[in-house]
């Protein structure tokens, strides 16, 4: 939302300098070079030119100086690293062949061995090299799937919780039609989940761990998955309080921290490399385990060199845009790029990562203009200019808006040209309609502020799903990919599809729970929390926040279904990046509004996944 503001445009207030320290967060304990920013907060009151009263938010300035970004270097671009990785890829494919031929496993363990192999490769972030092998392994497992689940092997004789839970999760994530009802048979007369009596303590813990992981991909109305999550959460928390630190305990801590809907594949890979070892797949030789780990580290570092190249492009775009001269907006281009590169980890998807970072930064700039800095008259002029979509539309705009409009116009058109090459058709009208709807939703919020109106919860929520900007951050980036998005598939993903509505709803609700207090302090009263409290005066603020969290949990299950439902006309691969945008942005709201205050977990994420390679 927007309106009255205070402060003239000024030069950027920051720069950053690197120094050596130890990373204290996210379970990565190796010493590394980090960037400690100089945090200078923008003032909250001032008078701009022409005497217009303006508000500005108390946002800290850019943490990552352009000079620092362009000083980054790496030696992992050398061909020798790529050649070594290619040799290891061939050797891992041979491991799959040995499993297929039964050379390294027996009929008593062939199902769990396949599942463990697929699971480890995915968690190490190298699964893109083994799509055919993974499909073959999962087809094999699914061929032995029954209403009671599976055992460790096709000749096990009895089903077990560990194999069934891991199978349920993995098969479901790959679109196989598997029912959660298989878990019912593992509940005892008290409703508790029981593991095999012959399992060791470590085996029992791993079974409950995989039960918890399976429960995270629940669909709506799956009571057994709700029971599984409650039971496994209590069990694992008690376990973590009792035992010393170990590889398994660190895995449990990570998954309980990030789950699936705030997990980022590159962050998970970085963490898993530190705990991956022989115990993950005891049937595999030590040498083969080391090869998997070496490949994961090489791939991580080779991609690190790609990140540096793309990040320099983003930083140059940001500097050339003139946004660095605007101290009333948040400068989070590096953070947005980091999120993109933490889930779009295929090197070929460079256009997606760059487009996502640019779109998100444009959304943030406009959010700060419409929410705080712009006057009502200026916002009306800017909205009208975007609807004209003509370079000459800047004539009626104030100086600071002219530059914003020009960068928006040029960037959107440039992305449309990229999409035209990948999709084989002109997509500029998709983008224009999305931006028009986005700015219209902002104008509605600006009117609420100017009139002191507090809308109904439903009115605010429906408008807020558009004003959050999910559609903007998703549409042009996915169209830049080499995945075809014909009109009928795009309709299933883009607004106002069920998929898009759920993803945007999750982010609007979650974002409001993190931002509503700061927004209210700036005069932006309307939020999911305030609107719901108005309609339910008997509830406390805490009651409403808890209710909103419950709504988010329900929407997540519905989004799971929209992504993973079997026999769908839209393949999972077509929806996956749109889904991953939702969970990446959700990640930024896990502890706080990580986009307004990017000095904590998000800063750590940049350092761990972008700035530093993993030691080989």
UniProtKB/Swiss-Prot annotation:
This is Alpha terpineol synthase, chloroplastic. Mg(2+) 1 binds at residues 367, 371. Residues 1-41 form a transit peptide. Binds 3 Mg(2+) or Mn(2+) ions per subunit. A motif (DDXXD motif) lies at residues 367-371. One of its GO terms (molecular function) is sabinene synthase activity. InterPro entries: Isoprenoid_synthase_dom_sf, Terpene_cyclase-like_1_C, Terpene_cyclase_plant_C1, Terpene_synth_N, Terpene_synth_N_sf, Terpene_synthase-like, Terpene_synthase_metal-bd, Terpenoid_cyclase/PrenylTrfase. Pathway: Terpene metabolism; oleoresin biosynthesis; Secondary metabolite biosynthesis; terpenoid biosynthesis. GO terms for cellular component: chloroplast. Mg(2+) 2 binds at residues 367, 371. The Asp-Asp-Xaa-Xaa-Asp/Glu (DDXXD/E) motif is important for the catalytic activity, presumably through binding to Mg(2+). Keywords: Chloroplast, Lyase, Magnesium, Metal-binding, Plastid, Transit peptide. Belongs to the terpene synthase family. Tpsd subfamily. It comes from Pinus contorta. Its EC number is 4.2.3.111, 4.2.3.109, 4.2.3.108, 4.2.3.15. It holds the Pfam family Terpene_synth_C. The lineage of its organism: Eukaryota, Viridiplantae, Streptophyta, Embryophyta, Tracheophyta. It is found in: Plastid, Chloroplast. Its cofactor is Mg(2+); Mn(2+). The keyword Transit peptide applies. Monoterpene synthase (TPS) involved in the biosynthesis of monoterpene natural products included in conifer oleoresin secretions and volatile emissions; these compounds contribute to biotic and abiotic stress defense against herbivores and pathogens. Catalyzes the conversion of (2E)-geranyl diphosphate (GPP) to alpha-terpineol and, to a lower extent, to 1,8-cineole, myrcene and (-)-sabinene. Mg(2+) 3 binds at residue 519. It catalyses: (2E)-geranyl diphosphate + H2O = (S)-alpha-terpineol + diphosphate; (2E)-geranyl diphosphate + H2O = 1,8-cineole + diphosphate; (2E)-geranyl diphosphate = beta-myrcene + diphosphate; (2E)-geranyl diphosphate = (1S,5S)-sabinene + diphosphate. The keyword Magnesium applies. GO terms for biological process: diterpenoid biosynthetic process; green leaf volatile biosynthetic process; terpenoid biosynthetic process. Its main location: plastid.
């Amino acid at each position: 939302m927007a309106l009255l503001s205070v402060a003239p445009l000024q030069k950027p207030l920051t720069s950053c300098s690197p120094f050596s320290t130890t990373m204290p967060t996210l379970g990565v304990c190796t010493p590394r070079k980090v960037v400690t920013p100089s945090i200078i907060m923008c003032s909250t009151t001032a008078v701009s030119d022409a005497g217009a009263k303006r508000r500005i938010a108390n946002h800290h300035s850019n943490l990552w100086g352009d000079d620092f970004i362009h000083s980054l270097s790496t030696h992992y671009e050398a061909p020798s690293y790529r050649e070594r990785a290619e040799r290891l890829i061939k050797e891992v494919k041979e491991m799959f062949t040995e499993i297929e031929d039964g050379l390294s496993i027996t009929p008593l363990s062939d199902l769990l061995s396949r599942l463990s192999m697929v699971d480890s490769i995915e968690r190490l972030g190298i699964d893109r090299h083994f799509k055919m092998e993974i499909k073959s392994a999962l087809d094999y497992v699914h061929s032995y799937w029954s209403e009671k689940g599976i055992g460790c092997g096709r000749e096990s004789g009895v089903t077990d919780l560990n194999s069934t839970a891991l199978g349920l999760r993995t098969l479901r994530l790959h679109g196989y039609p598997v029912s959660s009802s298989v878990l019912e048979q593992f509940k005892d007369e008290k409703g508790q989940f029981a593991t095999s009596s012959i399992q060791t303590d470590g085996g029992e813990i791993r079974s409950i761990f995989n039960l918890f992981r399976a429960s995270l991909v629940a669909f709506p109305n799956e009571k057994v998955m709700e029971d599984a999550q409650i039971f496994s959460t209590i069990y694992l928390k008690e376990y973590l309080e009792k035992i010393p630190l170990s590889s398994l305990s660190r895995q449990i801590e990570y998954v309980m921290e990030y789950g699936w809907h705030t997990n980022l594949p590159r962050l998970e890979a970085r963490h898993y490399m530190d705990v991956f070892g022989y115990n993950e797949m005891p049937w595999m030789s030590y040498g083969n385990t080391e090869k998997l780990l070496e490949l994961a580290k090489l791939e991580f570092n080779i991609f690190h060199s790609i990140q540096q190249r793309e990040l320099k492009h983003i930083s140059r775009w940001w500097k050339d845009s003139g946004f660095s001269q605007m101290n009333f907006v948040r400068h989070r281009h590096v953070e947005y790029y980091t999120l993109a590169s933490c889930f779009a980890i295929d090197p070929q998807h460079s256009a997606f990562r760059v487009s996502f970072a640019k779109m998100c930064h444009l959304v943030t700039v406009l959010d700060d203009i419409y929410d705080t800095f712009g006057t009502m008259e200026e916002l009306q002029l800017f909205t009208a200019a975007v609807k004209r979509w003509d370079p000459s539309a800047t004539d009626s705009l104030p100086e600071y808006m002219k530059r914003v409009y020009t960068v928006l116009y040029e960037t959107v058109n440039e992305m449309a040209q990229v999409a035209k090459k990948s999709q084989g058709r002109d997509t500029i009208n998709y983008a224009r309609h999305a931006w028009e709807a986005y700015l219209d939703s902002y104008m509605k919020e600006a009117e609420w502020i100017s009139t002191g109106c507090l809308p109904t919860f439903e009115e605010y929520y429906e408008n807020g799903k558009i004003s959050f900007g999910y559609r903007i951050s998703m549409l042009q980036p996915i169209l830049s990919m080499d995945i075809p998005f014909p009109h009928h598939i795009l309709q299933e993903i883009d607004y106002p599809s069920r998929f898009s509505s759920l993803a945007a709803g999750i982010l609007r609700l979650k974002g409001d729970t993190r931002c509503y207090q700061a927004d209210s302090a700036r005069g932006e009263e309307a939020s999911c929390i305030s609107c719901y409290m108005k309609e339910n005066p008997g509830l406390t603020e805490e009651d409403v926040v808890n209710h909103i969290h419950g709504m988010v949990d329900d929407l997540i299950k519905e989004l799971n279904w929209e992504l993973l439902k079997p026999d769908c006309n839209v393949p999972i691969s077509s929806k996956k990046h749109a889904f991953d945008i939702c969970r990446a942005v959700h990640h930024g709201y896990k502890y706080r509004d990580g986009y307004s205050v990017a000095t904590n977990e998000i800063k750590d994420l940049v350092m761990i996944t972008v700035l530093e390679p993993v030691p080989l």
